A protein has these predicted regions:
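Charged catalytic carboxylate motif
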Residues: 53, 57, 129, 136
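Surface-exposed intrinsically disordered loops and tails
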Residues: 9-13, 108-111, 122, 212
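Hydrophobic/aromatic residues within transmembrane alpha-helices
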Residues: 39, 76, 95, 159-160, ...
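Crotonase-fold acyl-CoA enzyme core
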Residues: 135-219
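Short, charged helix-to-loop "capping" segments that act as catalytic/coupling loops
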Residues: 26-35, 75-92, 164-180
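Conserved CoA-thioester-binding segment of acyl-CoA-metabolizing enzymes
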Residues: 1-84
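Short, flexible loop segments at the rims of nucleotide/cofactor-binding pockets, characterized by
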Residues: 51-52, 121-125, 145
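Glycine- (often His-adjacent) and acidic-residue-rich active-site loop
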Residues: 46, 78-131, 183
Length: 219
């Protein structure tokens, strides 16, 4: 699925990948590759929430863009709208359905049956490896622009924070930290960079209160 503002005639799918949770395109101008790529979360039915598999794909695409010498700009966005209610989202953070005590799980969440839990590979236990993608965004020598067509919540809000620039829909964009709602805290780059950008007290207000902010208020 691709979003309404996305014009397929101006982009081509980047070869060599078989992504299921994201889409990865290269901008095309007059039939030739341009130095911009578009990486989009592609789970609009769950507000583009990410699971470990999603983050693995995101990291691969980001790293490919990082090492592609004629790419200078990365657009990070979310496809939509949701097929169920028509709501737009950039990313709603981690998929809470698969969250365990040790992080987000590749396979079965806590509470699954014994037979299902025996399938869990210890090497693929719960983890918070979205932090690895955040670090790659911060330190890659390319401009990363977050394009927010709707909700940027929780870990999705943190991703927008760590990008170099953010372009948001005046009509649909909504920003919110959900830590207080789900009982977790972003101890990675998202919280640290937000405090550097807007100040310690306002950053704490955003994290502690979990209030919703429009694009105009966020600006």
């Amino acid at each position: 699925m691709t979003s309404g503002p996305f014009d397929p005639s101006l982009w081509r799918t980047v070869d060599g990948f078989d992504f299921t949770d994201i889409t990865y395109h290269r901008h095309v101008v007059d039939g030739a590759d341009h130095g911009t790529v578009r990486i989009a979360f592609d789970r609009p039915e769950v507000r583009n929430a990410f699971r470990p598999h999603t983050v693995d794909e995101l990291y691969r695409a980001l790293d490919h863009a990082r090492t592609t010498t004629d790419v200078g700009c990365v657009l990070l966005t979310g496809n939509g709208p949701s097929p169920t209610d028509g709501v737009w989202a950039f990313c709603a953070g981690g998929d809470q359905r698969i969250r365990g005590r040790d992080g987000y799980r590749y396979t079965m969440p806590e509470g699954a049956g014994d037979a299902e839990r025996e399938m869990v590979d210890p090497a693929r236990a719960g983890r918070l490896h979205i932090l690895e993608a955040q670090r790659l965004i911060r330190f890659m020598p390319k401009v990363v622009i977050c394009v927010v067509p709707g909700w940027a919540a929780g870990g999705g809000h943190s991703l927008h924070v760590v990008c170099d620039l953010t372009i948001a829909s005046a009509e649909h964009a909504r920003f919110k930290q959900t830590d207080a709602d789900v009982g977790s805290f972003d101890g990675g780059f998202g919280s640290a960079y937000l405090a550097r950008q807007i100040g310690q007290k306002f950053a704490r207000q955003i994290f502690f209160l979990g209030e919703e902010h429009s694009a105009q208020a966020a600006h």
